[in-house]
A protein has these predicted regions:
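Alpha-helical transition-metal enzyme core signature, strongest for iron centers
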Residues: 11, 38, 178, 182, ...
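Short Gly/Pro-enriched turn/cap motifs at secondary-structure boundaries
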Residues: 53-56, 80-83, 98-100, 124-131
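A structural signal for short hydrophobic beta-strand segments in well-ordered beta-sheet cores
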Residues: 63-66
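Glycine-rich beta->alpha junctions and the first turn(s) of the following alpha-helix
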Residues: 118-220
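Alpha-helical scaffold segments that form or flank carboxylate-/histidine-based iron centers
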Residues: 204-211, 236-248
């Protein structure tokens, strides 16, 4: 994308989170079914992780998936499901065994949000927006072929996906970093506070922009390097958590300068 000067794809749970997980853990059938549509932007995914009683302690989730012939029968609820009301499919953590330690009885399922028995309620935020939702499942039938990886071993997949999610969030801190971008920091500074020759006379502002750009570029290259290392390692890396923190702070700096 960068080599042909194409704009980055829109924020996508499919591209940034689920796609890499399917490449690593999915069956060939699952890859053929979902990856082309993800790449073409034809399908929107949401994430079924957090529950009313399982947020920070994600492994305490209680949404139940019971085997019934060739499918699972799903019952439970998720919360803070981003854009569930606009999504086509969901990747969801469910409990398939209640008689083992909580980290060992979790499975990773994919299913259509148009399935019978799903109810979505947007959560009204103080800002007036409603990108987060409550999602309820009542006897939702999910084909067993939609199980990613091995039954009861979904916690490993869940952690891997969270690693990709943290890298995605971290990368937001360096977005809009291209000089060619119409709304890049440099172009906005030239337009709003630039002189007739479009040069920015404010030395302090120029210094802030330069320092941000240096950190952003270094961070972007570091993310690339670690992403390459992730492909050859089966263990989740703690660096993704560090990157999420640094990327969030970097994004705050960007917003403060733009204001």
């Amino acid at each position: 994308m960068e080599r042909i000067s194409a704009r980055p794809p829109l924020l996508s749970f499919g591209i940034d989170m689920l796609g890499p997980v399917l490449l690593e853990f999915g069956t060939e059938s699952q890859k053929r079914e979902h990856l082309p549509r993800i790449a073409r932007g034809e399908i929107r995914w949401c994430q079924g992780y957090s529950e009313p009683g399982a947020g920070s302690d994600l492994a305490g989730l209680q949404t139940r998936a019971t085997e019934k012939g060739d499918h699972y029968l799903l019952n439970g609820a998720k919360i803070w499901t981003s854009f569930a009301h606009l999504s086509d499919w969901i990747f969801c953590l469910v409990r398939t065994d209640f008689d083992v330690p909580k980290h060992e009885g979790i499975s990773f399922l994919l299913f259509d949000m148009a399935s019978k028995g799903i109810q979505v309620k947007p959560i009204q935020l103080i800002s007036g927006s409603s990108q987060f939702c409550e999602t309820f499942f009542e006897n939702v039938q999910v084909p067993k072929t939609n199980l990613v990886g091995v039954k009861n071993e979904g916690w490993k997949i869940a952690k891997r996906l969270l690693q990709h999610e943290r890298n995605m969030v971290a990368g937001m801190g360096s977005r809009g970093n291209s000089r060619k971008a119409r709304y890049s920091m440099e172009n906005q500074a030239k337009f709003y506070v630039g002189e007739k020759d479009h040069k920015v006379a404010d030395h302090a502002l120029r210094d802030k922009i330069t320092r941000y750009k240096m950190k952003s570029q270094a961070f972007r290259l570091t993310l690339k390097r670690v992403s390459s290392e992730t492909k050859v390692s089966s263990n989740p890396s703690p660096t993704s958590s560090i990157f999420k923190y640094f990327g969030t702070e970097l994004n705050k700096v960007r917003c403060e300068i733009m204001m």
